[in-house]
Amino acid sequence: MIRDTVVSGIFYPLEYHDLIEMIEYCYLNPRGPKKLPSKLGRYEKPIGVISPHAGYVYSGPIAAHSYKEISKKVSGNITAVIIGPNHSGMGSVVSTMEGIWKTPLGNLEIDNEFSERLWKECDIIDLDETAHLKEHSIEVQLPFLKHLELLNIAKFKFVPISMSLQDYDTAVGVGYMVAKVAKELNRKIIIIASSDFSHYEPEEIASKKDAIIIKDILKMEEEEIFTDVVTNNVTMCGYGPIIAMIKAMKVLGAKESKLLSYSTSGDVTKDYSEVVGYGALIIE
């Protein structure tokens, strides 16, 4: 299947040059890393990042922090596993797919062998295009990846995993299988958990709730993340993908974590009465 874009022209620019300009703006923005991607990267080990998926004007500079780190730690042929929440509710509860996804910067191929192996070896994961047709959480990550490719930093294939079922057992099961297949296929891998943090709460409340989850992420404690999301009614959309990413990274030997940036939509709109939180973190 060749999947066309769904939110180009809405979440990010539709035209090639406008999108390049927007991505560079995200990197150079005061809320961003303030530097363009590194062209001197070298892949040494798997890395995992958390990247938000709102409109680029709101969350793009925060996402740029994660992709700046990726640019420093990749080279050659890379498989990017992108795990995102399923906002539409369409399709299977956890699914991957095969084929090609379009972006305004050019197409990105799915690592079909990886996707098929996940489907065949994991009872949790279906091979289902339907779940991906209208979903934006994975799509909005792809222009950042393609931009790195256009800079000759690395050559990417990717594996989309959409999750509408985000209970603890499902999330850790997905993470374990991602790590298992990466080892079996000897892939140079990065894992991107696509998630925003708290939604539509006053800044003070949202930032306090998000700080609790960020602390759990930095400790790489999957069970604490799940418990604190439920206990504190944290309205983050991708806690399951985050738990899956952390589980996979721990299986792959990760020992370190770092908060790269945190911000809210209020920093853009200047309306702090109802914000969405955005965080960029790295696990390696």
From Swiss-Prot:
InterPro entries linked to this entry: MEMO1_fam
Q: Which Pfam families match?
A: Memo
Q: What family, per the record? A: Belongs to the MEMO1 family.
**Under what name is this protein listed?**
MEMO1 family protein Mevan_0697
Organism of provenance: Methanococcus vannielii (strain ATCC 35089 / DSM 1224 / JCM 13029 / OCM 148 / SB)
